[in-house]
UniProtKB/Swiss-Prot annotation:
Pathway where this protein functions: Metabolic intermediate biosynthesis; chorismate biosynthesis; chorismate from D-erythrose 4-phosphate and phosphoenolpyruvate: step 4/7
Catalytic activity: shikimate + NADP(+) = 3-dehydroshikimate + NADPH + H(+)
Protein name: Shikimate dehydrogenase (NADP(+))
Family: Belongs to the shikimate dehydrogenase family.
Species annotation: Synechocystis sp. (strain ATCC 27184 / PCC 6803 / Kazusa)
Gene name tied to this protein: aroE
Superkingdom field: Bacteria
Catalytic residue positions: K72
Length: 290
């Protein structure tokens, strides 16, 4: 680990709690590989302290911040500017200083898209099905719209929350592509899904043997479909295990986590960053913790 001096610049993550965050693992590995005189640390900021903390971190010369739960939405009014992507998602996960205050964006969209873009597929005429309607699903919907996916189906168990999700969008392209359907519709929509995304927490600890879908539903996916789970531990999740048994292409949340972090680090440092180093550091940490 490089030594910290009086000239070392600070980056960090704010959340509450924040001790579980894997961002310091990835970012410090990259900073060390780049021989950059930066350090990335975790700042546990209680909700009632957010306003004073944002001002204080800025006044202290902190260069950039990752934002995690519970601050991703409530921090937005404290910023001088947010990107259109963050506005669409309704949340920020990355902040940087602009001389007047903090600006914000949402790199979850870029993180979600990166492994799909690697596949170099044409998404026009494709159908994507998203399980769940939380904050992660919002980033996925924005990403799929940027990808050019013309049919985006969000499936959930609460009709009220589905209606709220559908009515929360103002972008005409998103409104045109988006449908919301009850969970019971899955058996009808899964056979036409080119991409099936789990944005729910089902399958995470403390219930790693659970899956959001019965295996019988996974078996209804077309043989060319892609299964994408935003969960990154366990690896693979039960949902992705079932998809792998079908011989489907699978993507897990670890790559999204790496890519959203790399996108943030590029903003802060204004240069290319070693994504492979970040990926290796994260996967090594996950293997040790398994």
């Amino acid at each position: 680990m490089p030594s910290i001096t009086g000239k070392t610049k600070l980056l960090g993550v704010i959340g509450y709690p924040v001790g579980h965050s894997l961002s310091p693992v990835m970012h410090n590995a990259a900073l060390q590989a780049m021989a950059s005189d930066y350090a990335y640390v975790a700042f546990p900021i209680a909700p009632e302290d957010l306003t004073i903390a944002i001002a204080g971190l800025g006044a202290s010369g902190v260069q950039g911040l990752s934002v995690t739960i519970p601050h991703k939405q409530v921090v937005m009014p404290l910023l001088t500017q947010i990107t259109e992507t963050a506005r669409q998602v309704g949340a920020v996960n990355t902040l940087w200083r602009d001389g007047h205050g903090w600006q914000g964006t949402n790199t979850d969209v870029e993180g979600f898209l990166a492994p799909l873009l690697e596949l170099k597929q044409d998404w026009s005429g494709r159908t994507a099905v998203i399980l769940g309607y939380g904050g992660a699903a919002r980033a996925v919907v924005v990403g799929l719209t940027q990808l050019g996916c013309p049919e985006i189906i969000v499936v959930g168990r609460s009709q009220e929350k589905l209606a709220q999700f559908a009515n929360s969008w103002t972008d005409p392209k998103i409104k045109q592509a988006l449908q919301v359907l009850p969970w019971e519709a899955l058996s009808t929509v899964i056979p036409k899904a080119s991409l099936l995304i789990n944005s729910t927490p089902v399958g995470m600890a403390p219930h790693p043997k659970q899956s959001p879908l019965d295996q019988s539903l996974v078996e209804k996916l077309p043989p060319t479909a892609i299964a994408y789970d935003l969960i990154y531990t366990p690896r693979p999740t039960r949902f992705l295990q079932h998809a792998q048994e079908r011989g489907l292409v699978t993507i897990d949340g670890a790559e999204m986590l790496v890519q959203q972090g790399a996108a943030a680090l590029k903003i802060w440092l204004q240069q290319e960053v070693p994504v492979d180093v970040m990926r290796q550091a994260l996967l090594h940490h996950l293997e040790k913790s398994a």
